């Protein structure tokens, strides 16, 4: 069965190459399930035409909880249509492009296997992979799935946050090209494992050039817990 999110890409024959199939933006709104802030912009919807990719995110997009899901280190969030389709099978429900709050939905891109610190050319912008999406109570409230935080974390299909190295424009149909990869190889999936307590992976991650700066703040607690438990 052809998934709804892939229909347009299949029609154009574009799923065989790495590309953007949807650009998604959203504005903040109040919600009683939106954690302590009571407000969220997780509801991202596909937009037509070319969209500006700036240092702090996409034109027309809002980030409500910037410390957790915004700023220059997390300016853009990318998620693979293939991973969304995996979740379709797990959850038994349709998942539209943008439903996970991603700004860019890709096809033909191994986002889960992307390396921390690798750079992509997306449209006319250059971006760098900085880290995984860590699920939170707002995401759980939005999805309305039991035990969603744990389920999403355990799946190790978190999508990738991106730092914008060169501003530009992006639209559905634009190719995604890997420009460079760091010598130290830690994938998005492995970085999530590091976040949840793997000291060996965390030590490797700290050697990655271009990693998100937040790792330097997260690492001490992970390494200390590992040392205390050894």
Model region roles, listed by residue range:
Residues 155, 164-167, 185:
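Short, well-ordered coil↔helix boundary/capping segments
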Residues 1-141, 147, 180-230:
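Electropositive, beta-rich accessory/interaction domains or terminal extensions
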Residues 106, 159-166:
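Short alpha-helix capping/helix-loop boundary micro-motifs
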Residues 117, 167, 172-173:
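Loop/turn positions that initiate beta-strands
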Residues 157-158, 176:
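A structural signal for small-residue-enriched, beta-sheet-centric alpha/beta enzyme cores
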Residues 172-181:
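Basic (Lys/Arg-enriched) interaction patch that binds polyanionic ligands
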Residues 151-152:
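Short Gly/Pro-enriched turn/cap motifs at secondary-structure boundaries
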